[in-house]
Amino acid sequence: GVEFRMNVEVGQDVQMQELLDEYDAVFLGVGTYKYMRAGLENEDAPGVYDALPFLISNTYKVMELEHNQPFIDMAGKKVVVLGGGDTAMDCVRTSIRQGASNVICAYRRDEENMPGSRREVKNAKEEGVKFMFNLQPLGIEVDAYGKVSGVKVVKTALGEPDDAGRRRPEPVE
């Protein structure tokens, strides 16, 4: 059988060696506790959400667990998710499942260079997510009330590889 030990701090509540001695296999689901910011103008505007709080609030709602943060609901909204990794795929698919009216995933490179799982991208497309490639976000556009109204982007083309060997997206006119 499988035993789940949630909210357990390895090294404090249980020692790693104890787990290794007691079980044939150990999965540590440490999660992502630090979310990244893009440094875009107006990224703190109302209507802009960070991936991690969005996904966490959805998980608590689906599992009917109490949570001290508000539920972030995309029902009926037009959603743009910036990025091409698995977290972005989680966000677009969650938005679709919440009933968003339109979901777009904008990524700065082409589809072949997305870091996310091919299966996740395929599933997102099947669920109705639209993809826009070679678009680098420059900033968040806001209305007269300071609420998000769009995303300013520039078209890109792949240039020379970066230090990690991935071709850099470079703005094109």
Feature locations, PLM:
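A Rossmann-like FAD-binding core segment of flavoenzymes
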Residues: 1-36, 62-70, 97-173
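Glycine-rich dinucleotide-binding loop and its adjacent helix/turn
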Residues: 2-5, 35-98
